Amino acid sequence: MKAYAVPFEKFVNLADARLGTKIISVTDDWFADANRLFQPTPAVWKEGVFDDNGKWMDGWESRRKRFEGYDSAVIRLGVPGSIKGVDIDTSFFTGNFPPSASLEACFLASGEPDENTQWTEVLSAVELQGNSHHYHEISNDKAFSHLRFNIYPDGGVARLRVYGIPFRDWSAVGDNEQVDLAAALNGGRALACSDEHFGRMSNILNPGRGINMGDGWETARRRTPGNDWVIVALGHPGEIEKIIVDTLHFKGNYPDTCSIQGAFVKGGTDSQIETQSLFWRELLPSQKLEMHAEHTFVEQINALGPITHIRLNVFPDGGVSRLRVLGKVAK
């Protein structure tokens, strides 16, 4: 996998189609469906492929504007959250990209935006280039549920990535309700790992079961002593009651065994947490894994009390499709 271009790429992509992100309204997507903006895979070029409206493009593309104004798309994020940064990707759009773009946001507990909705500008107009990634950090701790993506005056954008921290009203969770505290939809975040050569570490926190091997976390073959690992920050502190390690689609490349450590972390940077994790207590002792299967652990879990972070160790290497860490929220 390619290296992270910017630090905020490690946050959850709130605009991922797999989380349910979709277009609510769009001024014009004549040439290319605006919902393609949210596909998790990189944009592709299809040489010589045309449809009824022109050249097929992997992204959102509007018609050439012949009057005043600009194009925009109203987006419902798959999960509300605070935004840390965005990537406006114009891959393969060369003579047809917008010269600039901006981003507005709002939070609605229910329903969709209308003409009375108050929008907050989170990214003022920025210049765009063709066939390029445009990374912009955003400093706003408010949670947003919808975006309005403006392009000036028209053109095409391949992907819109919106990285941030998912929002959940934890006060509404019942005292005895069991929640997947590691789920991306609940604010869980993969912080660091030993290796992610074949698949991103963040994939293991996505909803549903993996669609293929590429939709999981997979390391390179280990040729040195040791083992691979990934550290996850839980969406909320909690007491762990059940753990699911899913090796779906991993058959000749699943880990032989796994274990999990946990801790209640009160401070420190992501890099400091990586070092601290060596000394965390054992939450789940070493367990044998099988290929292409869900492994559920309950009785095997050690009672550590409330924790905020876990470290999944896989021995010696291999792939994991999903990790579920279920428990009760610490009030």
Swiss-Prot record:
SUPFAM superfamilies: Galactose-binding domain-like
Pathway: Nitrogen metabolism; (S)-allantoin degradation; (S)-ureidoglycolate from allantoate (aminidohydrolase route): step 1/1
Catalytic activity: allantoate + H2O = (S)-ureidoglycolate + urea
A single BP term in Gene Ontology: purine nucleobase metabolic process
Key word Hydrolase present: yes
A molecular function (GO) term: allantoicase activity
E.C. designation(s): 3.5.3.4
Keyword Transferase on entry: no
Keywords: Hydrolase, Purine metabolism
One Pfam family matching this protein: Allantoicase
Matches recorded under NCBIfam families: allantoicase
PANTHER family, alphabetized: ALLANTOICASE (PTHR12045), INACTIVE ALLANTOICASE-RELATED (PTHR12045:SF3)
Entry similarity comment: Belongs to the allantoicase family.
Protein name: Probable allantoicase
Organism name: Pseudomonas fluorescens (strain Pf0-1)
Gene (UniProt): alc
